[in-house]
Structures are given as structure tokens and as C-alpha cells.
């Protein structure tokens, strides 16, 4: 699950990992997401999310509904803000959480990364320098 655009593209690039697994997607209902995820099960979430209390409340309701319907064992996200309610509700429901910090933040954290870092089961970074910001992270290198 993640915002459309680059965040969703990062997740899609992990196709060798997820292609044979049961899955669903949560992202913005935008043309790029619909095109990329054609034929996939997709739930739309509310946007814009930029530091918006209204978006957080709406996406928390969506997260509650989707996660209670789907009951995932694992939630993976590359951000952005829409990940926060899904991760916290997912954690309460017993799902394992994997967060992949964005590629273009090398020496400082993202707001979403800061918010989900304490509850993730695996926090992945793409640069060794990011481990200074997230000491418990695992550096798997670039997704690209």
C-alpha cells in the first residue's frame, strides 16, 4: 500500500517477491495507479494526505474497513502518509509490518518513516547512510 506515483512504483518493482502471493493494493484512485494496477484488487484511499487531519481521519476509517475485510498477514508500504493508519491498525490486528523508506531521503527521515519506525517488524532502507537515522533498519540497497 502506498501513495500513487513513485511510492507505488517502488512497490510494483518488487513484483518478483509478490507476484505469486495473494494480495490487495491500497492507493489513490488516480489514472497512474489504475493503469499500473489493472487487473489487481485495489482499494482507493483519500488524498491529498499532506499533513491533513481530515485525510488521516478518512484514511483511518478506510484502513479499519479494508483491514477487517482482508485480514492481511503482512502489510508492506513505501509511504507516504496513507501508510500510518494502515500500519497502526494492522499492528493491532497482528499483521507483520514492513516499511521501505524512500530512495531520495539519504540523511534524514520522512515524517511517515518517523511515525511507523517504532512499530515496524522490518524497516528497510536503500542507503547505508539512512541507518544513521534508523539504526535498527536493514539496508537492502536500491529497489531500482
What residue ranges belong to the model's regions?
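Conserved nucleotide-sugar phosphate-binding/catalytic loop shared by glycosyltransferases and other
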Residues: 2, 20-59, 129, 140-143
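Histidine-centered beta-alpha loop that forms part of the nucleotide-sugar donor binding/catalytic region
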Residues: 3-4, 80, 101-104
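Short, well-ordered alpha-helical microsegments
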Residues: 7-10, 33, 83-86, 108-109
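Short amphipathic alpha-helix
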Residues: 7-19, 30
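An amphipathic, basic-hydrophobic alpha-helix
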Residues: 51-73
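An aromatic- and histidine-rich active-site surface loop
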Residues: 72-93
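Active-site-proximal region of nucleotide-activated glycan assembly enzymes
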Residues: 95-144
Amino acid at each position: 500500500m502506498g501513495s500513487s506515483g513513485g511510492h507505488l512504483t517502488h512497490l510494483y518493482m518488487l513484483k518478483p517477491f509478490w507476484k505469486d502471493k495473494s494480495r490487495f493494493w491500497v492507493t489513490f484512485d488516480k489514472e497512474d495507479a489504475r493503469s499500473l494496477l489493472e487487473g489487481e484488487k485495489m482499494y482507493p484511499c483519500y488524498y491529498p494526505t499532506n499533513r491533513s487531519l481530515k485525510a488521516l481521519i478518512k484514511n483511518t476509517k478506510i484502513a479499519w474497513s479494508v483491514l477487517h475485510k482482508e485480514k492481511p498477514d503482512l502489510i508492506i508500504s513505501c509511504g507516504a502518509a496513507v501508510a500510518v493508519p494502515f500500519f497502526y491498525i494492522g499492528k493491532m490486528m497482528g499483521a507483520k509490518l514492513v516499511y521501505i523508506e524512500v530512495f531520495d531521503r539519504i540523511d534524514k527521515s520522512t515524517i511517515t518513516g518517523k511515525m511507523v519506525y517504532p512499530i515496524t517488524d522490518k524497516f528497510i532502507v536503500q542507503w547505508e547512510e539512512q541507518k544513521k537515522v534508523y539504526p535498527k533498519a536493514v539496508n537492502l540497497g536500491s529497489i531500482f
